A protein has these predicted regions:
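Membrane-proximal intracellular helices of multi-pass ion channels
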Residues: 1-290
Length: 290
């Protein structure tokens, strides 16, 4: 699965960083691994991403006792689960939502890189799938040596946007996503019933979006807006200097999104201004949604 012999410790490190969706690498993933190696890494990222996100959903319950009424109510609230015994259904929902969002992301990524990568359609499709998984699972590993500032994709600003959105959705976590899916289902069902005459007006169901969801979404929006603004300000005449306005905005947005959980690079870290490095450190400390 490698193009040349690499030390066992490096292979172990890459496997660990993939399944733990950390994104740190000791070798160039693009040149050190074959296509089979990249597939293995993608599978490890997917397993780790689903595992970590599922684990974090249940982590708060792990020390509280299986039969505790408080635990059951917390589980019901966290996962938006009406029946506390329906954990298998929750796991299936997690798998479905993961594959659905990654599939949509892979489609848009492919449409943006189509005709621009060596290796033809097959390589472009794999690039799209790999990066959709890597972004949604917040791994930050790329099959290009230059990551997101590789010459092949550096000017693909739509690609930067889709990568950022996948990172954001993956970082929010499944309890948040399920909350909004339940709200969407409620709104659609109300609309359909009004259209077919089964009810005359919108029926409000309170507390579909819980307090935890409100806090996470609002804090995420604040961090995205302020992070992008500060990144743009600090790097405007530095790494963003030669880019068009659209490129500056796209790179600043991804540059503010990726430090919190993912690890994709929109520029060589050694070339960033000291204030940008401090901003990156702060965003890394804050991280994603709890």
């Amino acid at each position: 699965a490698t193009t040349h012999r690499i030390p066992f410790i490096d292979a172990l490190f890459i496997s660990t960083t993939s399944v733990c969706v950390t994104g740190l690498t000791t070798v160039d993933v693009a040149t050190s691994f074959t296509h089979i190696g990249h597939i293995i890494i993608m599978i490890l990222i997917q397993i780790g991403g689903i595992g970590v996100m599922t684990f974090t959903s249940f982590f708060a319950l792990s020390f509280m006792g299986k039969s505790s009424f408080t635990s059951k109510m917390m589980l019901k609230d966290m996962l938006n689960e009406d029946r506390t015994g329906g954990l298998f259904r929750v796991i299936l929902n997690i798998l479905f939502v993961t594959l659905f969002i990654e599939g949509i992301g892979a489609y848009f990524i492919y449409m943006d890189v189509r005709g621009s990568l060596p290796g033809g359609t097959q390589q472009e499709l794999f690039y799209a799938m790999f990066h959709a998984v890597s972004a949604f699972c917040n791994a930050g590993i790329s099959t290009l040596s230059g990551n997101m500032y590789d010459p092949l994709v550096a000017d693909k600003y739509n690609l930067h946007f889709w990568i950022a959105m996948l990172i954001i959705f993956g970082g929010l976590g499944f309890p948040i996503v399920f909350n909004y899916l339940k709200l969407l289902h409620h709104l659609l069902m109300n609309g359909i019933k009004i259209l077919i005459g089964k009810q005359k007006h919108y029926i409000h169901t309170p507390r579909i979006i819980n307090v935890h969801t409100y806090i996470v979404v609002i804090s995420t929006l604040i961090l995205l807006i302020t992070g992008t603004a500060f990144y743009l300000f600090f790097e405007y005449d530095n790494t963003l200097g030669d880019l068009p306005l659209r490129g500056k905005l796209a790179n600043a947005f991804l540059g503010a999104v990726t430090p919190r959980t993912a690890g994709f690079n929109v520029a060589d870290m050694a070339t960033l201004a000291p204030p940008t490095l401090m901003l990156t450190l702060i965003l890394m400390v804050i991280g994603a949604a709890p």
